[in-house]
Amino acid sequence: MNVQENVLPSIELLVLKRDGRTVSFDQDKIFSALRRANQELEHPVSEAGLKIVLEAVLAEIGRRFEKDVQIYEIQTVVEQELLKAHLYDLAELYIQYRTRRDFRRHQATDINVEIHKLLSKDQSVVNENANKDADVFNTQRDLTAGIVGKSIGLKLLPAHVANAHQKGDIHYHDLDYSPYTPMTNCCLIDFKGMLAQGFKIGNADVESPKSIQTATAQISQIIANVASSQYGGCSADRIDEVLAPYAELNYQKHLKDAKDWVLADKQEEYARAKTQKDIYDAMQSLEYEINTLFTSNGQTPFTSLGFGLGTSWFEREIQKAILNIRIKGLGREGRTAIFPKLIFTVKRGLNLEPDSPNYDIKQLAIECATKRMYPDMLSYDKIVELTGSFKVPMGCRSFLQGWKDENGQDVTSGRMNLGVVTVNLPRIAMESAGDKDKFWEIFAERMAIAKDALVYRVERVKEATPANAPILYQYGAFGKRLAKTDAVDEVFKNRRATVSLGYIGLYEVATVFYGGEWETNPEAKDFTVDIIKKMKNLVEAWSDEYGYHFSVYSTPSESLTDRFCRMDTEKFGIVKDITDKEYYTNSFHYDVRKNPTPFEKLDFEKIYPAVGASGGFIHYCEYPVLQQNPKALEAVWDYAYDRVGYLGTNTPIDHCYACDFEGDFEPTERGFKCPNCGNSDPKSVDVVKRTCGYLGNPQARPMVKGRHKEISVRVKHMNGSSL
């Protein structure tokens, strides 16, 4: 309800916020606070009664204050007027609500409170990152350090940014690492340059490798060190093309040996067979190395391998080895590898069509996706169209925009992202109570706060020195080799680095204004598209102002889907199709409870990256078991090629080793169980679900409640009759 009517006095005051900001007086906020407290009463006050209280509050504020007023002074007036009206129960609840908020604000920076949550295994702490096993010592150490980092970080942030984060208006990502340390987020490691020129890790000067086995061993060491020097994911772009020269060294060595020991007409065949085995063994070692690594962050490195564009014999063999190794699985039981994320590029004229030269590898990639969910698919031409040049995402979905260096050369590898701040869009919609003018007013306020938060992120990472992370700044991971005294801004400025404005919950936003079945309503769709367009216009202006690439990022929201919804449930109560689900819908995604066809879903979602959300995005389709019908998946891939840039496959691949069931496990309150025998023991089941951009194993490493709820209600976009 909007209470700004003619019968209410108009007040022109400035409100001095706790965080030091000055904002215009807004009587709707007082009324909303009264309504929230009133909803908790067994016998609530009527709407008319609340309005009488508000009139008295406004009259008293107008009488007592002329130019500005403090927040606590407004609250005192409200409490006094409630007591004057003999609304003692409502006054008590209002005071409790305010006190509770103050208490939580102080708790957030109290290390003892957060340590207690960790020791008591509060799921919001131990399950915040589904890639971290909170039972092991090194993860516990990281979580403990993270609590200290968050506490100090909140004190370092500009007061209004910290306040907005604590209230749930925005989310300042990775507070356990930044701004306490000036770490960067995710990157595309310059493996090509590092392998060619050598590098240094610790006390070891590492020379350029002389074989593919040594090259992959070096890559695993680089990944471990880079992942320990930043907090986000790391990706290898065109790994098949990067490794091919080292595979060729193996071939030349085997060919030289063959000339001494093998008949002339068999020498090339011998060298190829030996090299093929070397390639397979090297790529298998890399897969095992990544899955057995633990970084100083207490987790397996978030790693992505991009491949598929190479055409030489060596490049093709590397592509095939990556896929065949993933199909085989890990260990004696052949479990699905969670890392590295595989990203296969499809390109017209190369592997898209049946008569293209690498079509056979596309077929292998599709087989792999039906059995292991990875690889995800990149559409070469669409990525170029959306981002200005081709590259794989950093981590799971963060895309760099096209960028040329001082020599006019297109550069992707060696670039990075400096961090993310996500805005709670559903909250803005609910605060506006269906008034679009109010929505855009609050939207502008939140975007201004997000801008300040992102600018602070940039300024903080610039305070690092090359000595803080030698692998990144001095030895080539970031594409340049700085001296110890150089400014790290050399690898960030002139839009070389990105910094991301995230968002969540377009579905919920439109639901506030148009109801939960809005997807076929053009007016509702246009409204959500306008939100992305406005965000894009803002980040372009910020980029021009500051010289760093601000981008619009479709946040993965692994735990944020839970945090924002939980906080808004406390603020607005149970709201149909919004907070009652116990999660918020990721970015621009179609409501997961509905079942459009894959083609309808992609057609619905394709506009959002195109109009601005190109700084980070991914599309998914949910399928039944596909292993007996890979052509169904190929049909979706082919349809997607000219429509979306990045597509993931979600298909049931859970396995029970007790009864040998394979398919889709049933969700339980905190995990999943075999539908055949009820087994839920992580030692004898392999449960693999799409957690966000990455896969996760929720039975072994549980996720937050909101994400579990969202996974549990996902509906297939293709049924048996569609296959």
Identify the role of each PLM range:
Residues 1-118, 708-709, 713-714:
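Charged, amphipathic alpha-helical regulatory modules used
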Residues 678-723:
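Long insertion/accessory domains within large nucleic-acid-processing enzymes
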Residues 277-283, 287, 512, 704-712:
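Metallocofactor- and cofactor-centric catalytic cores in central/energy metabolism, strongly enriched
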Residues 13, 57-63, 303-304, 508-510, ...:
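Short, hydrophobic beta-strand segments
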Residues 56-62, 82, 527-541, 710-722:
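Short, mixed-charge aromatic SLiMs
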Residues 241, 499-512, 533, 690:
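Contiguous, well-ordered alpha-helical segments that form the cores/surfaces of helical PPI scaffolds
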Residues 100-104, 111-495, 516-517, 521-683, ...:
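Conserved catalytic cores of very large enzyme subunits
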